[in-house]
Amino acid sequence: MSNRNYIRTERAPKAIGAYSQAVRCGQTVWISGQIPLDPVSMEVIGNSDSDEGVRSQIEQVFANLNCICKDSGGSLREIVKLNIFLTDMSHFHLVNEVMETVFEKPYPSRAAVGVLSLP
């Protein structure tokens, strides 16, 4: 018997592959990775060539996460761990700046990884 509940919200980008936006299993919600897609147009927002553009992309990712959290009955405040993937580690300080506006102390645990590319 499965106690899984598959979460789908129109307020965040739909899945662009063979995965669910999120899955609730018991009291834990597992959220799939997010990229800076506008949920309506399904287009990547912002320009990754400027700090302002990257900041808007980071804000969009957290907005998407917030919608999935809320529509699964939770909030960003309940996030325990974040895995962050960046194609340019020089933008790491922007992640910190945005996180300080999105989360309250104490912050969730976090890993940040530099990668060659993202979808």
Predicted regions and their residues:
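Short, polar/acidic, helix-capping and beta-turn segments at strand->helix junctions
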Residues: 2-119
